[in-house]
Amino acid sequence: MKKLIFILLISVSIQTFGGGGWPQPKRGGYFKLSQNFIGSSNFFAPDGSIVDITTVRLYTTSIYGEYGFTSRLTGIVYFPFFVRNTLNEIQYNQSGNTEPGDALQSIGDTDISIKYGLIVNKPVVVSATLLFGLPLGVAAGGSSQILQTGDGEFNQMLKVDASYSFYPKPVYVSAYAGFNNRTNSFSDEVRFGAEVGLTLKKFIPILKLNVVQSLYNGNAEEAQNGIFSNNTEYVSPTLELNYQLNDKWGVSGSGGFAFAGRNILASPNWSIGAYLKL
């Protein structure tokens, strides 16, 4: 009985941070306002090498929310309501000529998901998630028509998560695997990853690893200056630090980078945020 109670308590604690095999409890929720930034003058080319590009920056302000409709069924929304993509001015030393910079701002591609708990209230919990990616962003914008706040394709992803708590230690691990069906001649993707987290009362550090592998079965053009491209691949570890201010409110920060990739910026991705638990 004590073990079951501990498992329930640690699962409720982990649920509030989203992701993993735990659905939200009925009428429970997790809502987060985040600011994300990535800027780079380096790019992972299609062959995996790192090449120089004109400096590009992407700023994303977003809302992420999870709400438990039942003890097994959770609704999830990711809405980047303000995305700004910029391209630096280029100045040629020999001629003195310049190419002006460029900027684009709009909303971004939005994800709507349903998660269902297949196995709950056990040391190992398993859930399945169906995600719909709505192409609300701009795939070709700015005066240069090369800036983006989205990829312009409607995707559907099916993902399975499994999580395990190491009773009596406040440690958990999670792993997932998913298939992402992309439209508009974009290649489909296989995605998988893992994370390990500690629930140290108010301080919750989480280490994540995400991997995206293209199936190379689409012929859409590959972007050469951002993250919204066909045949994007990467292996990316991320460290996330969460701090509980009280029972409901908390703050978080994270930093991640791709140590291998294709068709994606070759620089760290930074994020800060504040969250509310119901």
Regions found by a protein language model. Give the residues of each.
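Repeated loop/turn-to-beta-strand initiation elements of outer-membrane beta-barrel proteins
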Residues: 72-77, 122-126, 169-173, 202-207, ...
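Outer-membrane beta-barrel biogenesis signature
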Residues: 15-45, 52, 202
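Residues on the lipid-exposed face of transmembrane beta-strands in outer-membrane beta-barrel proteins
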Residues: 33, 63-67, 77, 112-116, ...
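Transmembrane beta-strands of outer-membrane beta-barrel pores
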Residues: 35-41, 79-85, 118, 132-138, ...
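Hydrophobic, lipid-facing positions within transmembrane beta-strands of outer-membrane proteins
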Residues: 29, 59-63, 108-112, 154-160, ...
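Outer-membrane pore/translocation modules
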Residues: 86-180, 228-229
